[in-house]
Regions:
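Conserved beta-strand-centric core segments of catalytic alpha/beta enzyme folds
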Residues: 1-60, 155-225
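Short glycine/threonine-rich loop-to-helix capping motif typified by GTGT followed
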Residues: 79-88, 117-134, 152-158, 191
Length: 225
């Protein structure tokens, strides 16, 4: 918007007993490996880490960027302090507004990095939102939280890096530990690691407590015509 030439964006979070005990009290921790979007999912795995990116205005660029942040949105459905609405209202608004701000069509989205925590409520809610937006054809999607866990305050920064690398390297990441589709939506994520895939547009979701939902849309800048 012409306010800054560049900004460093991202997040970091570290595990501690307080956080672990808090999630345990909510009874949403999986004591084995989490299973995002699977029928048998029981909860999440916590992780820790950091992820940062540099955003630059087009006029300040001195080299070819990895990609463009073409769309973004932050919404709050205020449904519950720790839960998402069953119909996925917050996720629906967040994704819809991010896509609308980018000016691209639904059919142009090549991959979705879903929030996909592995909890029964989150995955059903996000799945409902995906169905509401895309209908029968949902683009290839997966959750990387089966690799890295839910890194909480770092998750959006880390998963933005995954999304940028998806475009830059032509990658689609597998949704680990998936066996059976959840009955709420019947959605089936990508389960194999794919390389050399022409990826032009990636939608990345990060949803938080209190219904605070964010979606980012990254787009290639040098994709062949």
């Amino acid at each position: 918007h012409g306010l800054l030439d560049a900004a460093i964006v991202g997040g970091t979070d570290a595990l501690c007993r307080f956080t672990l005990n808090g999630f345990n009290s909510l009874m949403i921790l999986d004591k084995t490996h989490c299973r995002p979007f699977d029928r048998s999912r029981t909860g999440l795995n916590l992780g820790e880490g950091a992820g940062y990116l540099v955003l630059q205005s087009e006029s300040s660029l001195q080299r070819t960027p990895y990609c463009e942040l073409s769309g973004y949105a932050n919404t709050n459905e205020a449904y519950h302090q720790t839960g998402s609405s069953p119909e996925g209202d917050g996720a629906f608004l967040s994704m819809s507004e991010a896509i609308a701000s980018s000016g691209i069509s639904l059919e142009e989205i090549d991959y979705i990095n879903v929030h996909g925590t592995g909890t029964p409520g989150n995955d059903a809610s996000e799945g409902m939102a995906l169905r509401r937006i895309f209908g029968e054809y949902v683009p290839p999607f997966s959750s990387v939280k089966a690799f890295i866990g839910h890194t909480l305050g770092a998750s959006e920064g880390i998963e933005a890096v995954y999304s940028v690398l998806s475009i830059d390297k032509g990658l689609i990441y597998p949704n680990l530990n998936f066996t059976d589709a959840m009955p709420e939506t019947g959605l089936i994520p990508e389960t194999s690691f794919q390389e050399g895939i022409p990826i032009r547009h990636v939608l990345s979701n990060s949803f938080g407590f209190g219904g605070n939902d964010s979606s980012l849309l990254f787009s290639a800048t040098n994709f062949p015509a």
